[in-house]
Amino acid sequence: GGQIYRDVDRAAASRGHILGADYTDGRRLTGDLRQSGVEHISGAVVWAIEDEFRISYTCEERGAQIEADRILLATGALERPMPIPGWTLPGVMTAGAGQILLKQSGIVAQGAVLVGSGPLLYLIAAQMVRAGTPPAAMIETQTLGDMIRALRHVGGALRGWPYMAKGLKMLAEIKRAKVPSFTGATQIAVEGEGKAEAVTFTHKGGRRRIACETVFLHHGVVPNTQAARSLGIGHHWDAAQSAFVPELDAWGQSDVAEVFIAGDGAGIGGAKLAEHAGRLVALKIAQNAGHLSTQVCNRLAAPPTPRSDTGTGRTPVSECCLSALCGRVKPCKQHRDLPL
């Protein structure tokens, strides 16, 4: 997890004006972590969690193990796969991968085409505009019908008006940069001989073709549940998000004793909700370990409340944004082989 703050201590000074205040705010958390005295092993890859919570990982090309009494998983989210014809061609990657290039290396693809839907697509487009390298086009899959259906969440969205204001600001940045936008696109495909050379799609009844060498795909995010599943934690289907989420109580404790989950790995809610969820889990772990009484734990936990208003791990405003921008992931009615 933690992709929103990736490399924040190093990149904030040089690229903070491009990545925005939500990104640079991560220095507050990394600063608190350094002052806490907690041992922080960065750049590690965990590849096994065995009996008695023996964790095997690799760091700086060396293997190591550590044992724990309790485990807190904060694995974050994964981008939902968007398999379209040509998606395996060199030059095609997820929008999140494009953002990682910007955060870690300051690299912005020239003339890239953004394809899909979701708030992250607008964020990356706005960041590319600020970097002086706007996308060649945005090809969006959400329809007018999706926007209309999202109106039922407008009350919750207004309660979270600062988020709406941020979204409107991003849209204004993209519009001022005159980035071509095509909403309600269908039959999207990437063309090319050995690499991406163009994106073709249907828009308002006509076929269009935009030449490009880089394509960023995005169709929302889902919880990264690989570690949770490997531990045997129960999961259930979240119909609103069209994804499996782990079975957790209000504090983030799973049905496997002494395993807790916080952040988007527990259900998509964004960075701020993840931060609050992490605090709740930390309090519960401290209580279970005998360092806090139940009364003190409950007092420190409120507010925020253990769960959001929707009961799904998402805030009212995120419900509105996800519904409007992503629509509902529609099940395929007929299977057919596609040229990939």
Question: Could you describe each region identified by the protein language model?
Answer:
Residues 1-340:
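Residues forming the flavin
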